[in-house]
Each structure stands twice: as structure tokens, then as C-alpha cells.
Amino acid sequence: MGDKVKILAFGDVNGNFEKLFTNVERLNERAGPFEACLCVGRFFHPDGSSNDELLPYLQGRLKVAVPTYFIVGGEDANPVDGLPTDGGDLCKNLTFLGRAGCRRLPNGLKVAYLSGAYDSRKYDESAVFHRGGNSFKPFYLREDVQRVVDASKTGEEEELAGVDILMTAEWGEKFDTLLDESVPNPLEHRPVNTLSPAVTTLGASVAARYHLAGTENVHIQLPPYVNELHATRFYGLGAVGNETKVKSVVALAVTPTIQLALAAARDGVNENADATPCPYTAKPRPKPVPAEA
């Protein structure tokens, strides 16, 4: 089956860079070595305030211990001078993946990613009016989502094995379609719905073996669900340094799809007899009928 790649994944960093990189270094010493760290959700401070904690790393005075790849959510990512809007390195071992797409990391993992947040007022507008210049818009467009879908299916390898990891800031609408009492909906009583129909599209269309998302400050692993090639495991991750001590990190060991034949890639379903249908396309479970008195 090939060698597994050990990675760390964190939820929203929210500008808590010192805590993030200290945690990564500590975990790498205790349980590593890890070959990558992936960050989903809001990476920079939510209100666009100072990101001074990042400066020592950008200036080379402090080092990022593990190659770190991040996306952004709906925060203002522009306070950091020189943020490459289409992705690139901020400093050694710290890489912004970009707005939307699919790429292979040096460790062999194939990741699909979508930065930004869903805004129904902007979603169907043309990129002509929102792209260009040096500023990064905090929302994504329908064509960005389609770009991720297309990139995840381009090439013989992707057609056979899909991608290893889907990274989004948000959770998708209908993620809870098939949940029951054994896995309660952690967002059921939230006063504001922050779920994204665009992420629903990605969850249903991208054959990823893992889907990582932040934003909700919830740590949860949902039962694996069937995609068109194998099975997807969804992880919601808490924010780094959150006051309620929600777990913000998960460690994974992943065999890159490049090392898997089609039959091995499909073993994801065979190895998980409890894999559910895709929640994004499935019909809701019927509600229990109360017993008559």
C-alpha cells in the first residue's frame, strides 16, 4: 500500500501564530516527525488587526518547524504585505495554497482547497469584477468552486484515485443529513447558519479521502461516507487557542493516492462496512413516529 505520510491538521488559527507554531514544534518532537501541517479556516486575525506574531517568522528570526500549508476563510487577509493572492510562500515552510485549486505537496499528498467564505450576494458574480490587484477578496465565486471540482478530476490519476484531502474553511450544508442519536449534530442549536452550499457541492463532487474544515470551533469526526471512488472522512476542527478548550488538531497518517492503484483506493469503502451514503446527496432519515398512548 506504500508508505504513509504523517501530517497535522489545525482549525482556525485566528492570528495565534505563536501558539500554532509552538504546538507544531512540540508535537513534532513528541510524536513526529510530521511531513506537513495543514491549516483550515481563518488563518489571520478575524477583524484584520495586527498580525505581528507572524513577523519573526517572515523575517527569519524564528523558524516554522514543519512545512505548513494554509487557506483563509472570511477574514481580512490583506494586512500581511505580499500575500500571494494565487498562492505562494510567505517564508520558509509557510505556504498559502491560494484561492482555489488542486496541487500535489512535496510529500506526495494531493490536496484540493477553497479559500474564502460563502456570500450569496457575490457567489454568482463574474471574476472579472473581483479579481486583479494585490488585495484578496474574502469571498469565493461559483467559478472558484467549479475550478476545484475540475482540478480534482483532471488527469488519469485523479480519475482513478481522486485526491487525498479536501480543505475548506466552512462546513457544507446537509452535512448532518444522516446523523442520528449516536452522533448528535454539534451545530443544531447555533443561532446563525454559517453552513455553505458551495462546500456541499465540493463534498459531493470531489472524491477526497479526507475533508478538513474549520470556522465552527467544533472538533468532530463524522462516520465515513461513500464518494464515487472510495470513502471520505470528515473532520471539523476547533480554533487554535480557543477559550473553551475545544481540540484544534488532529494527526493523520495518509498513503498518497499516487501510490495507490484503483482497487486499493476503493478499499476505503471495503475497510469501512459502516460507511454511509453521501450526506450531501442522500435523503434525510425518516423521523421516528411517536408511539400512540
Protein language model regions, located:
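Extended recognition/assembly regions associated with phosphoester-bond processing machinery
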Residues: 1-293
